[in-house]
Structures are given as C-alpha cells and as structure tokens.
C-alpha cells in the first residue's frame, strides 16, 4: 500500500499504487443550477457508446433527481453508510477530512494481501464497496422530480429573505469522474483498468478483463458496469477519440442548457488562472468535487445549486459549499469583483472545441483552443431591442415587441 496525497481531502491516504499523475488530466465542471434534466446528454452518450447487446442497462451518462433519485439505486446511500462518520476539520483556513476513505475503511494490511497466484483477493474485496444487484440498474429515472422539504399549501410562498426554498430538488448529471486515484483501477485484480498518461482518461482493457467485477465493487459512483453478454466490465471512455482531436465529449457538445465545461485540471500548486477548469476550481473556488470524502480525487466538479440547504450539500460536495454558493450568486448578480467569473460562466458550453484558455474583456468573453486560436466569443450583456407596438409600414400591430 502506498501513501498518496489527495488535495481534495487535505491529507495523505492509502492507495494500492504509488502516486503517478498523468501529463494532463481530463477534467470538467458542471453548473447544475442550469441543468433541466432534458436527458439530451444521456441519449447522446447512449446512442454513441452503449447501444449494443448486454448494454441495455448501461448509462455512462445519467441525470438523477436529488435527493431521492439514484442510478444504480441508492448508490450514494450505500457507500456513505459503509464509510461511517465523515467529519472535516478546519486548519488554517483549509479543510482536512478525518474519516476513512474507501481505501482505509476496512483497515486492511495491504502489504500482506493474497499472493499473485490468487488474483481475485488481491485488491478489490479489500476496498470498501459493493456490487449492485441487477435490479438496481433497472430504474434510471427513479425519484425523478420528487421534492424534499415542506408540503406546499395554498398560502405557501417563498419570501425574498429566504436563502433556500422550503421545498426543493435538483438535477445531478453524472459521468465517470476519471479519478486521480480511481477505485476501479485499484480494485482490478488483473490490472485491466488503467489511466492514460497523455490525458488521464481511465479505461478498461477488455482483452485483459477476466470478469471478476471487482472494478464494479470498487467504484463508489457506480460508473463501472458489467456486460453479461460480453463477460467484461465496461465504462465511460471520456470520448477519447474526440478529446484527441481537441473536441469536447458527446454529452458536453449536446448539452442544451450549456452547463458543461470540458478541459484539463491541474493540482492546486500548478493551477493556471487562464485555464477555465483551473479557474473555476482553484481560483474562484466555485466548483466542488462530488463526495470528496470517498478518497478518489474525482475530476468532475460541480457548481452547487443555490436553492438547496447547505446541510445536504456539504455531505455531497464538502465543507466549502456556502462560500461557493455566495461567490456564484455574486457573479450572477454582476458584482464587478467577479466579472471574470461571470464571463467564464457565459462562455460555458458555447463551442464544440475544448477551450484551453479564456479571457474576459469589457464587452465579451473569449475562448481559445490549444493553438491559441479563437473558438468562442460571447457577449457579457445580451443586446435587447424593443420594436414599436404599431408597424406603420405593414399597417399592423405587433404581438411581440421585445
């Protein structure tokens, strides 16, 4: 067992392999305040990657309604229950996770694990996790649009001074996080799961897979899925053919709400403020990882929903939720201090090309590709035009004048 540093939890932790970060790390930010659960992302992924035999139950991209929706069923409740108490300690303005990660919860002496001639017991079953039942994959829309909170009566209203709504839900779009310390890679007894050095995408070598399903057990996010027809595990491939061409993945390109930004994510000490993902995660600190306490250092980040109580969101995104929500709201209000963030939020989802650098001027936000070529321009303020109610040239009244 190696000791690796996980910056998301502020400490070193146990992991089956030594720390070895790739040259670049595939990363993403989702603004879930804008997600409408249209499932266009889900269908674009499904029709591209998982329309074969044995893949009927697979959704490498899915959108679930929180707090009650989940695919597979109760994936998050299952792993959180198994981890026990998950407390954070604040230390000089930074947060340190004091609970166990999935690699530490079973208190295994990894140096005395089973020998190489007994591969099934080498890693997977020592990582805290579970294999979902086949029925757990059968209800991808379970809990859709079901709210939590108070029951609305005829006189229920939302006052201006309420920070969150008395009744709430939100949509959580999910893909593979292509984690820095991937549970699926740590759990595979035959090392069929690997991380690409050139972009950090986590893939399964299906020719090497021996169907132990330990990657399924070891992925707490439920994103490694077994194909019973092919007798192999399969997962999101990060749309690597598109990424290699400088394009964003299918689910990003087809997102109607423009909630997704794809790019490269660096560790905090190597952050580049002109890099959109680095800026949202490290500079503005408005985008947060999903269940960082699990210990995988996931590389998909979320701007938390402003209408949801902090207690629920802290469990999901960590202790910086309140600050992230405040910063996001200030940017959306137009506070001058957050003009750069506001410009980047406008730029999200505006091009099929990967934006590697961005700039914000008084008039517009501009995105550049890896060659420094402009691939997107969006105005900071949308122009508005008001037409006369009566059109004298056509001798007609207009029904829509804005």
Feature-to-residue mapping (PLM):
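Non-ligating segments of multi-cofactor redox enzymes
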Residues: 1-402
